[in-house]
């Protein structure tokens, strides 16, 4: 049963939407736009034409209406009850720009794939971006979660970030303003990142290519990159590895319905066929509960879970076996 009413929300925005150039879709299926290929409907999905269009749209949306943004849909688990309010899905046309803007500096739009900035850096002999070649997703997500891999992190390269807040006001944030820590930024949660400036350093192209090849080979060997997955499921606890804790607790290959902890890399959760959002999240909480029981460590989700549970299908953290 449908849990959202997008047309009602669209009507409430009034005549101002006629000036909006982007695409507005009521009751948009989220399973078509996320890497897990699971979950319910977005009450209203908006794909802005560009930053000006995004600003104009946000000024129309009442403050009490929830707004969230997605990029390419990686690292995202949508619950089956759908997402109330507005989901903003940035488009490659308006937010996928990628260009050199100064010596060793690259400007990247929020929807630009992470691997593309690595490739551009290689083409221009700019070091420090090799690690992006192994990160699924887009620059906006990397900025929001301080994405990193293979010894590199986003915070090491960011110079400034351009963003729009919930009310449609524009902001420019410095690296310090972003307040980066492990897989986290202190930047306001309502900020929608539109693009950013990154800085690397001169480096021999052969060295960059070697590092990128090593990242690619490692990823292809140990990660289920051809499966329907959101990437790393849980953050690594300090001084430990999530996959190792899961493996020791018996979680490798565990299945619930169509959801499975990958036998190849057990910190990757995969949709083996037609898994629901409920099955994926229930599997994740089952694994958290097992790790807690086995090692006493509370794994934290790295994948972002959004939306509402279907009535009668609510899931408690650690399946209620601990104070989450």
Swiss-Prot record:
Cell wall formation. One of its GO terms (cellular component) is cytosol. The keyword Cell division applies. PROSITE patterns: FAD_PCMH. Belongs to the MurB family. Keywords: Cell cycle, Cell division, Cell shape, Cell wall biogenesis/degradation, Cytoplasm, FAD, Flavoprotein, NADP, Oxidoreductase, Peptidoglycan synthesis. Pathway: Cell wall biogenesis; peptidoglycan biosynthesis. It catalyses: UDP-N-acetyl-alpha-D-muramate + NADP(+) = UDP-N-acetyl-3-O-(1-carboxyvinyl)-alpha-D-glucosamine + NADPH + H(+). It comes from Sinorhizobium fredii (strain NBRC 101917 / NGR234). Residues 36-203 form the FAD-binding PCMH-type domain. HAMAP family: MurB. InterPro entries: FAD-bd_PCMH, FAD-bd_PCMH-like_sf, FAD-bd_PCMH_sub1, FAD-bd_PCMH_sub2, MurB, MurB_C, MurB_C_sf, Oxid_FAD_bind_N. This is UDP-N-acetylenolpyruvoylglucosamine reductase. Its cofactor is FAD. It is found in: Cytoplasm. GO terms for biological process: cell division; cell wall organization; peptidoglycan biosynthetic process; regulation of cell shape.
């Amino acid at each position: 049963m449908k849990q959202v009413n997008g047309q009602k929300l669209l009507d409430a925005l009034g005549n101002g939407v006629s000036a909006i150039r982007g695409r507005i879709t009521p009751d948009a299926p989220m399973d078509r736009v996320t890497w897990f290929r699971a979950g319910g409907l977005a009450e209203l999905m908006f794909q802005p034409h560009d930053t000006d269009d995004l600003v104009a749209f946000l000024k129309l949306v009442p403050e009490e209406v929830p707004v969230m943004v997605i990029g390419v849909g990686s690292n995202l688990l949508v619950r089956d009850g759908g997402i109330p309010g507005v989901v903003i899905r940035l488009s490659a046309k308006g937010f996928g720009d990628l260009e050199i803007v100064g010596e060793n500096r690259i400007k990247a739009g929020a929807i630009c794939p992470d691997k593309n900035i690595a490739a551009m850096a290689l083409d221009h002999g700019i070091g420090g971006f090799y690690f992006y070649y192994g990160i699924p997703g887009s620059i906006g997500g990397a900025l929001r979660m301080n994405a990193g891999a293979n010894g590199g992190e986003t915070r090491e390269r960011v110079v400034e970030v351009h963003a729009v807040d919930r009310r449609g006001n524009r902001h420019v944030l410095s690296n310090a303003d972003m307040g980066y820590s492990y897989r986290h930024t202190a930047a306001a949660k309502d900020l929608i990142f539109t693009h950013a400036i990154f800085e690397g350093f001169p480096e021999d192209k052969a060295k960059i290519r070697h590092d990128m090849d090593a990242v690619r080979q490692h990823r292809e060997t140990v990660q289920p990159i051809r499966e329907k997955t959101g990437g790393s499921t849980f953050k690594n606890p300090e001084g430990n590895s999530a996959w190792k804790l899961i493996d020791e607790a018996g979680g490798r290959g565990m299945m619930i319905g169509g959801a499975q902890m990958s036998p190849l890399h057990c910190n990757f959760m995969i949709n083996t066929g037609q898994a629901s959002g409920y099955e994926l999240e229930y599997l994740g909480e089952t694994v958290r509960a097992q790790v807690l029981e086995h090692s006493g460590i509370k794994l934290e989700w790295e994948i972002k879970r959004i939306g509402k549970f279907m009535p009668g299908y609510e899931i408690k953290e650690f399946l209620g076996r601990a104070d989450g």
